[in-house]
Design a protein with these regions (language model features):
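Conserved ABC ATPase "signature" region
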Residues: 100-115, 166-167
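Conserved ABC ATPase signature
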Residues: 119-123, 127
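Catalytic Walker B motif of ABC-type/P-loop ATPase nucleotide-binding domains
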Residues: 144-148
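A short, proline-enriched helix->beta-strand linker immediately N-terminal to the Walker B motif
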Residues: 138-142
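ABC ATPase NBD coupling module
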Residues: 63-76, 214
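Glycine/charge-rich catalytic "coupling/switch" loops of P-loop NTPases
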Residues: 237-240, 262-307, 325-356
Length: 356
C-alpha cells in the first residue's frame, strides 16, 4: 500500500501539492495529466530521486520519505529501457538477484523465454521494455512506478507490452502507479484514475466516473472523451447469429461481442470477456429521423434530452437507454427540426466502438 500525506515540492512555475493519496495493495492507479503538469516530478519524489519540501511517503506503513532509493522497495520503469548493453536478456533480468523461482515466473509471464540468450541490441523497443519490467520485478518491489512506459514503443508492439503488464499484475498483484498523458492506456489498465493539473491532484475516481463526470471544465477539455460506458463483454462466438453479425475484417485478437450495461446492449469487437469499458466517439454516430437500412449493427431509437450550444457546434444529449452525446451543426439542427423531446435514431458500427 502506498500513502502520500501532505506532500509539497516547489516546481517552477507552480508547487506540486498532494494533500493525501492512498493506493491500495494490488491496485493499479493511473495519473493522467497534460505535459508539464508535474507527473514525472511526482514519481521522482516517490522513487527518492528528489526530496519533498514537506510531507510523507508511506510504503506499507513505513515512512520512506528520507530513505535513499535503494532502500525504499520501489522499482521504476521509464519511457526508455535502460539495459546493460554487455549482458544478454537473461542476465539483464536477473542482474543482482538469485531467486530462480521468481526468475522463471517473470520470464514466463513476460513471454521472454525464447530471448534469454539474445543480446539486447537486437531487441525491439517493446521487447526492451519487457526486459526492463522483468528486471524491475526481480527485486520484489512493494511498489512499481511507471513513467509513460509505453510512450516510445511502436503501435504494433504497444498492445503486447500492455497485455504483458496486465498479465503480470493479475499474477503478482503488485501495487502500481503509472503516469501518462494517454487516456486510452489509463482506461485499459487502471483500477482508479487521478488527474494532475499544474501540480494539483484535481480529481480521482473510477475511470467511468472521471470521464463521465469531470470535476471541472478544464478536466473535461483535457480528457476530451464522451460516451464512455462501463459494462460487461460477452463473446458472440457461440451465438447462432454470430456469422451474420460479425463485422469484417476484425483486428487481430478481437472477436464479435455484446457489451451489456444495465440499460442497453451494444455490438462491439472486444479482446476479452468480463468487465470493461466501451467508448464511442461522437463523430462515429450517425443521426437519422427514421430507422435506416444499414450494415451498422448498433441502431437505437432515442429522445433528445438536451441541446447545448458550444460555439459553432451543437451538442445533443440523447437518451437511448444510455445517454449519448453527439455534435451537429446549427444548420443540421434546423434541417432536422430537433428540439428537446424529439425522437431520433442513433446508428454506429461495432468496429467504431473502442473497448477496454
Amino acid at each position: 500500500m502506498l500513502v502520500i500525506e501532505e506532500l509539497k515540492k516547489a516546481l517552477a512555475p507552480f508547487v506540486l501539492e498532494i494533500p493525501r493519496l492512498e493506493i491500495q495493495k494490488g491496485e493499479t492507479f493511473v495519473l493522467l495529466g497534460p505535459t508539464g503538469a508535474g507527473k514525472s516530478s511526482f514519481l521522482e519524489l516517490l522513487a527518492g530521486f528528489s526530496q519533498p519540501d514537506e510531507g510523507r511517503i508511506l510504503v506499507d506503513g513505513s515512512d520512506v520519505t528520507e530513505l535513499p532509493p535503494d532502500q525504499r522497495r520501489i522499482s521504476i520503469l521509464f519511457q526508455e529501457a535502460h539495459l546493460f548493453p554487455h549482458l544478454n536478456v537473461g542476465e539483464n533480468i536477473g542482474y543482482g538477484a538469485n531467486d530462480t523461482t521468481l526468475f522463471a515466473q517473470v520470464i514466463e509471464l513476460l513471454g521472454l523465454e525464447h530471448l534469454l540468450s539474445h543480446g539486447v541490441s537486437v531487441l525491439s523497443g517493446g521487447e526492451r521494455q519487457l526486459v526492463a519490467l522483468g528486471r524491475a520485478l526481480m527485486v520484489r518491489p512493494h511498489i512499481l512506478l511507471l513513467d509513460e512506459p509505453f510512450n516510445s514503443i511502436d503501435p504494433q508492439s504497444r498492445k503486447g507490452v500492455i497485455e504483458a503488464f496486465r498479465r503480470v499484475h493479475r499474477e503478482i498483484q503488485i501495487t502500481s502507479l503509472m503516469v501518462t498523458h494517454n487516456f486510452e492506456e489509463g482506461l485499459y489498465i487502471s483500477h482508479r484514475l487521478g488527474i494532475l493539473m499544474k501540480g494539483k491532484l484535481v480529481q480521482t475516481g473510477a475511470p467511468q466516473e472521471v470521464f463521465s463526470k469531470p470535476a471541472s471544465v478544464q478536466i473535461a477539455r483535457f480528457l476530451g472523451a464522451e460516451n464512455l460506458f462501463a459494462g460487461h463483454f460477452e463473446s458472440m462466438a457461440d451465438s447462432e447469429s454470430s456469422a451474420v453479425q460479425s463485422p469484417s475484417p476484425q483486428p487481430e485478437g478481437y472477436f464479435p461481442a455484446l457489451f451489456k450495461t444495465d440499460s442497453a446492449t451494444l455490438h462491439v469487437l472486444a479482446d476479452h470477456e468480463g468487465p470493461g469499458y466501451a467508448l464511442i466517439q461522437p463523430k462515429e454516430i450517425t443521426l437519422s429521423l427514421e430507422p435506416m437500412h444499414s450494415s451498422a449493427l448498433n441502431q437505437f431509437p432515442g429522445t433528445v434530452k438536451d441541446i447545448i450550444h458550444k460555439g459553432s457546434l451543437i451538442q445533443l444529449e440523447i437518451n437511448a437507454g444510455l445517454v449519448f452525446k453527439v455534435f451537429i451543426t446549427s444548420q443540421s439542427l434546423q434541417e432536422m427540426q430537433l428540439a428537446k423531446g424529439s425522437k431520433i435514431h442513433l446508428i454506429f458500427k461495432a468496429s467504431s466502438v473502442k473497448t477496454y
